[in-house]
UniProtKB/Swiss-Prot annotation:
Name of the protein in its database record: Formate--tetrahydrofolate ligase
GO BP annotation list: tetrahydrofolate interconversion
Lineage: Bacteria, Bacillati, Bacillota, Bacilli, Bacillales
Keyword annotations of the record: ATP-binding, Ligase, Nucleotide-binding, One-carbon metabolism
Molecular function via GO: ATP binding; formate-tetrahydrofolate ligase activity
Species assigned in the record: Bacillus pumilus (strain SAFR-032)
Catalytic reactions on record: (6S)-5,6,7,8-tetrahydrofolate + formate + ATP = (6R)-10-formyltetrahydrofolate + ADP + phosphate
Residues engaged in binding ATP: T69, P70, A71, G72, E73, G74, K75, S76
InterPro entries: Formate_THF_ligase, Formate_THF_ligase_CS, P-loop_NTPase
Top EC category: ligase
Length: 560
């Protein structure tokens, strides 16, 4: 199969999609459990959990990766391809993925629905507005901002300190000009002037809450617990105190339902939720994962960026919230990323260099050690690119086998599910025969500083953590408000194991600087901001949006 001259969108547009009712039938869904959005998309009613409450749950397989290049290493492609591969070997499988954000889609990535012959479809719709979940989250989030300012304008009964409002507005785009703004200008009629700012929607606590809530009741409880500000006595002010948890639940009731779509080969996929992994917890919704586990024998899901970010949060935050144990972990490695970690310039990554691959393989080694620290069975998946040579692929496989790490090369971009069957077969054996000793990296009763230190030392390979004076002050407030039992969510660069994106490979002798600690009480974790990580990204010099267009025949171009 020669596909190197076809783009992802070309391949997607040539695919013949099946009616979404046919995909639902593969899962034995009832008609009343399906809410169709056109011909190829649907939401699944949460009432399905009542019907399947006695159903045994399938195995959840987490796909993670090494520290990526800016273009990504095809983790979503491997996730989709592996789900298709399970069906190829006769297993009932579902893929559970995050929804793409318009910010990176318009910015650098151009889309995030997999690639080649391992995509979720309809790719154009999934990458753009999809079923409107992100718009609902954005609306609910910004409605809360409006309610806060309105409360202050009409007498401020809760005595909110306008200097200590911690609830920013959001937008699902990269817009650096909105990072810091002033609202309420123009006189008394326009409210109380104050500093504000915008985060990207996928970094918002509202997104995290939607992705960690177990049902509508839990959603409302979490929304009620959101801390939006502090009063003049320094006490937290919550959504529950303002009284708006009901309307926020109403705004999010449909967004809470998972979205059913299909892969290019007709494998069912639940694409739902989408928090960033570098500035949020980076996993698809808990509801979608739990639903998938009730509907299939194997659930293939992913967590954003490398094992130092998405996987760590999946294993420390998501599994804890959902009380489930993953069956195995797939660690995606690529020749080009290992060459980058081996010191090659990004402009040279297409050139053959086996020595650079072996020099950079220590980055893979650290991510393997991280997964081992959680006690889970794992396998390395070498994701093939057209520019890879046999010698480079062989070098990775030889190193893995020499160090007793299971490894399989995959070519799911070009071959679809067929290119991942060896990986799927190996995973079924791993899950059945390999001991699963899953445990969390830290306990709830560890102090926040102990949790931060364990993540830094065990996952990043750091010597420890250093808290700025601002973070120390925030830590004292967290402990005073009895939030110290919550897990930590590290906001860190995805390009390095450290908090410095320039430190590639496997750096040593470094510490992680915690510059700020933000309690996300509704989501159920403490966000620890490190380095220079931003919660509202900016666009590159030439955004991917420049290449996007709608042609006269209605076809879309420029998504990839």
């Amino acid at each position: 199969m020669i596909t190197k001259h076809l783009s992802d969108i070309d391949i997607a547009q040539q695919a013949k999609l099946r009616p979404i009712q046919d995909i639902a039938a593969k899962l034995q869904l009832h008609d009343e459990e399906l809410e169709c959005y056109g011909f190829t998309k649907a939401k699944i009613s949460l009432t399905i959990f009542d019907r399947l409450k006695e159903q045994k749950e399938g195995h959840v397989i987490l796909v993670t990766s090494i520290n990526p290049t800016p273009a990504g290493e095809g983790k979503s492609t491997v996730t989709v391809g592996l789900g298709q591969a399970f069906e190829k070997i006769g297993k009932k499988a579902i893929i559970a993925m995050r929804e793409p954000s318009l910010g990176p889609t318009m910015g650098i990535k151009g889309g995030a629905a997999g690639g080649g012959y391992s995509q979720v479809l309809p790719m154009e719709e999934i990458n753009l507005h999809f079923t409107g979940d992100f718009h609902a989250i954005t609306s609910a989030h910004n409605a809360l901002s409006a309610f806060i300012d309105n409360h202050i304008h009409h007498g401020n009964e809760l005595d909110i300190d306008a200097r200590r409002i911690v609830w920013k507005r959001v937008l699902d785009l990269n817009d650096r000009a909105l990072r810091q703004v002033v609202v309420g200008l123009g006189g008394q009629v326009n409210g109380y002037p104050r500093e504000d700012g915008f985060d990207i929607t996928v970094a918002s606590e509202m997104m995290a809450i939607l992705c960690l809530a177990e049902d509508l009741t839990d959603l409302k409880k979490r929304l009620s617990s959101i801390v939006v500000a502090y009063n003049r006595d320094g006490e937290p002010v919550t959504v529950g105190a303002l009284g708006y948890e009901g309307v926020l639940t109403l705004l999010l009731k449909d967004a809470l339902k998972p979205n059913l779509v299909q892969t290019i080969e007709g494998t069912p996929a639940l694409v739902h939720g989408g928090p960033f992994a570098n500035i949020a917890h980076g996993c698809n919704s808990l509801i979608a994962t739990k639903m998938a586990a009730k509907l299939a024998d194997y659930v293939v899901t992913e967590a954003g960026f490398g094992a130092d970010l998405g996987a760590e949060k999946f294993l420390n935050i998501k599994t804890r919230a959902g009380d489930f144990k993953p069956g195995a972990v797939v660690i995606v490695a690529t020749v080009r990323a290992l060459k980058m970690h081996g010191g090659m310039k990004k402009t040279e990554l297409k050139e053959e260099n086996t020595q650079a691959v072996l020099k950079g393989i220590h980055n893979l080694e650290k991510h393997i050690e991280t997964v081992q620290a959680f006690g889970l069975p794992y396998i390395v998946a070498v994701n093939r690119f057209i520019t890879d040579t046999k010698e480079e692929i062989q070098a990775i496989e030889d190193w893995c086998l020499a160090h007793d790490h299971p490894v399989k090369a995959v070519n799911v971009w070009e071959e679809g599910g067929e290119g991942g069957t060896a990986l799927a077969e190996e995973l079924t054996t791993l899950i059945e025969k390999k001991k699963n000793s899953f445990s969390y990296l830290y306990e709830e009763d560890d102090s926040i500083e102990e949790k931060l230190s364990k993540v830094a030392k065990v996952v990043y390979g750091a010597d420890g953590v250093t808290l700025t004076s601002k973070a120390r002050k925030q830590l004292a407030a967290i402990e005073e408000n009895s939030w110290g039992h919550l897990p930590v969510c590290m906001a860190k660069t995805q390009y390095s194991l450290s908090d410095d994106p320039a430190l590639i490979g496997r750096p040593k002798g470094f510490t992680i600087t915690i510059r700020e600690l933000k309690p996300s009480v509704g989501a159920g974790f403490i966000v620890a901001l490190t380095g220079s990580i931003l919660t509202m990204p900016g666009l590159p010099k030439k955004p991917a949006a420049l290449e996007m267009d709608l042609l006269e025949d209605g076809s879309v171009t420029g998504l990839f």
